[in-house]
Amino acid sequence: LDGDSTLVQMGANANEIVIPKISMDGLADYSRNSGYVDGDVTLTNETVSFNYDRGRAFSVDAMDNEETAGVAFGKLASEFIRTKVVPEMDAFRFATYAGTSGISKVTAGATLSTGADVITALRAATTEMDEDEVPLEERYLFITPTLYGTVQDLDTTKSREVMNRFASITLVPQTRFYTAIDLYDGVTDNSDSSGANEKPGGFVKAATGKDINFMVVHKPAVLQYTKHTVNKVITPQENQSADAYKFPYRVYGLADVYENKVAGIYLHHK
C-alpha cells in the first residue's frame, strides 16, 4: 500500500510532508444563450507529520560469529526483520487505519464462525463502499488466514463471487491484526508497579484493542510512506567500542488516511 512519493513534497520541518488535495464544483445547467456556468477548482495542501520512528542495535561478538561459521550474525539480521520489524510495521499500520475517525466499519463487533458468515460480511463491506462511491479498482482485502480458510472450505455450490471484487487478497495473522496496539519503548520497566516491562520492545495488543476479522483498503485513501531506513553492518574493524559485529536498524515513516477519503477504509472486527 505504499503511496506514490512523487505526489508529495517535504514540509517546512524535516518531520513533515505536504500532501496535495483537490476539490471542485459539480455540474451546472448549460444555457444555450450564455453557455457554461463557471466552476471553482481548489487545490490545497495538507501538512502531515511522520508518526513512526523505531529502531534497535544488536552486537554479535566476533568470536561467536567465527565459531558458528558466520551463522550467528547472518541469522540475526534476517530473523530480526522477518519476526520483529515486518510484524510490527504491519500491526502499526492496520491499527492506525482502524483507529481513524470516520472510516466505515461494522456497527457492532462480531465473530464470524462460518464461511457463509464471512461472505455475508464481505458482501456488506463491498456494498457499503459501492454506495459511498469508492472506486472498485485498487480495493485490497486483508483477512485472517482462519477466516479465509472457512471461505475456501465452503461447499462448491456456495457463491464466492464477492472474493473476486478485490485487487488482491492478503492473509494477515491475527497476532498483528488489531484495532489498537501499544508500542514498547525498549527502555522502561514498570512491572514492579503493576505495569508492563517494555524493555523487550516490540508491540502488544492494547487494552482497548479488538481483533480485526478483515479490512478492505482502497489504496488511494491511505498515506503510507517510508522516508528513511537504516539497515547496515558495522564490522569489528570499524567498531570502536567492542570486538563485535554491530547491526543497527531504524525505520522512519508515515501511516495515515486522507481525511476526505475515509470511506475508502472498511473495518470488520470482533
Where are each of the predicted segments found?
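Sequence/fold signature of self-assembling virion shell proteins
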Residues: 1-3, 10-26, 46-51, 68, ...
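Short, charged/polar N-terminal "headpieces" of proteins
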Residues: 1-9, 126-131
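Short coil/turn segments at secondary-structure boundaries
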Residues: 2-5, 94-97, 139-142
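Structured, hydrophobic secondary-structure cores that serve as assembly/anchoring elements
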Residues: 18, 24, 37, 44-69, ...
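Short, glycine/acidic-enriched capping/hinge loops at junctions between secondary-structure elements
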Residues: 29-34, 260
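Short, mixed-charge, low-aromatic patches
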Residues: 32-41, 76-84
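Alpha-helical scaffold segments that mediate packing/assembly in large oligomeric complexes
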Residues: 65-134, 145, 267-270
